[in-house]
A protein has these predicted regions:
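Secretory targeting signatures
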Residues: 1-18
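Propeptide-to-catalytic entry region of secreted or membrane-anchored zinc metalloproteases
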Residues: 19-135
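Active-site-proximal beta-strand/loop segments in catalytic clefts of secreted hydrolases
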Residues: 42-46, 86-89, 148-153, 186-188, ...
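Short pre-active-site segment immediately N-terminal to the catalytic Zn-binding motif
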Residues: 50-56, 156-177
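Catalytic zinc-binding patch centered on the HExxH motif and its immediate surroundings
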Residues: 94-97, 128-166
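Active-site recognition of the HExxH zinc-binding catalytic motif
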Residues: 173-190
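Surface-exposed, short loops/turns at beta-strand junctions within beta-sandwich domains
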Residues: 329-336
Length: 344
């Protein structure tokens, strides 16, 4: 995402002179909610005694996993995120497990075997949204990324409006990251069932295609990922549950197997979604005013290590990068000029 600001300056001549009894805990704050991706965690199957122990630990562990250096693109963009924990108390711990005839009393009705798939763990999204909206009421916090932590050890998860996972499972952190690929970046699964053939149209997800000639990710063709297991970006047959007729961009990324990085196409999609929520500049000098030689023009970026700011006068680059520029240092002749700050 690019942001361009236009300042007017006047160089004078010498003669002129901002439900469930749930509570909210902010666990990571990198800036105003209006210009950050707000990660909202909600838990199910946690009793009151587990909220500040098990649930807290599950959320903290998940956050640490997201911003682990091996899970690009999140570490580079950490300052673009805030994170908040909605504390919802259940009467009993765990989740329903119909196949094993286990039923527990939880606030959000988390259950395995959703849609008849044993490992598909999900909860009542209406109840989850009601709890979260109540906890956030009056806080000014947006809901940009929805994350559902379920207090269960059995493998399972699901990605829809909410990314939901069994937080007590041994691979819980990978499940969480994979499901966020669905819920936030709208990515498709890249694994498949042997023998299945695709007979539908072109999928709308960016990481699967039914027709390589459409060139869905041609701009990345030949890119050799630093992770050798991901390999070179190409069109690999087998994706979205079908062995034939659908193609994925890489041999083996996070959307195909757990404990893998995201490939370039998925990383790019995450970054695009981040910039839909975050303006690269947090604040700037009033750009509706006119300034003189004694003034300094400035902007504040979300993260100067990620965002470069280039300055222009009347459309011509000054070759200057930085968050401020002194007008006097530009050595402009007397007159009126337009100065632009462009985030890169």
């Amino acid at each position: 995402m690019f942001r361009t600001l236009l300042f007017a300056i006047l160089i004078g001549y010498p003669s002129l002179a901002g439900c469930f009894g749930q509570t909210l805990t902010t666990v990571m704050n990198n800036g105003d909610s209006s210009n950050r991706v707000d990660m909202i965690f909600v838990g199910d199957g946690y009793q009151a005694s587990e909220i500040v122990s098990t649930y807290r630990d599950h959320v903290d562990e998940t956050l640490s996993a997201f911003f682990n250096p091996g899970i690009a693109p999140f570490p580079r963009y950490q300052n673009f995120f805030n994170a908040h924990r909605v504390n919802v108390i259940s009467n009993e711990s765990g989740a329903d497990d119909p196949i094993n005839n286990i039923f527990v009393d939880t606030a959000l009705d988390a259950t395995y075997n959703t849609n008849g798939i044993d490992r598909l763990l999900y909860f009542n999204t209406t109840k989850a949204n009601t709890a979260v909206n109540s906890a956030l009421s009056g806080s000014g916090i947006d809901i940009d990324m929805r994350l559902g932590s379920v207090n269960s050890e059995k493998y399972g998860g699901g990605g829809g409006q909410w990314a939901v996972w069994a937080a007590g499972n041994t691979v819980a952190l990978d499940i969480a990251i994979h499901e966020v690929g669905h819920s936030f970046a709208k990515l498709a699964d890249e694994y498949y069932t042997s023998g299945q053939s695709w007979g539908g149209g072109e999928p709308n997800q960016v990481n699967v295609t039914s027709d390589p000639s459409l060139g869905k990710w041609d701009r990345w063709l030949g890119y050799d990922d630093p992770d050798s297991d991901i390999g070179v970006i190409d069109y690999y047959e087998g994706a979205r549950y079908h062995e034939f007729g659908l193609y994925r961009p890489s041999d083996n990324s996070m959307m195909r197997s757990l404990n893998r990085p995201f490939d370039a196409i998925s990383r790019e999609r995450f970054i695009e979604e981040i910039y839909l929520e975050v303006d690269p500049l947090d604040s700037w000098l009033d750009d509706s005013s006119t300034y003189s030689a004694d003034d300094t023009l400035w902007v504040n970026s979300v993260d100067a290590s990620v965002i470069n700011v280039e300055w222009y006068v009347d459309g011509k680059s000054l070759g200057l990068l930085g968050e401020s520029v002194s007008i006097d240092s530009l050595s402009l002749a007397a007159g009126t000029y337009s100065v632009q700050a462009k985030s890169l």
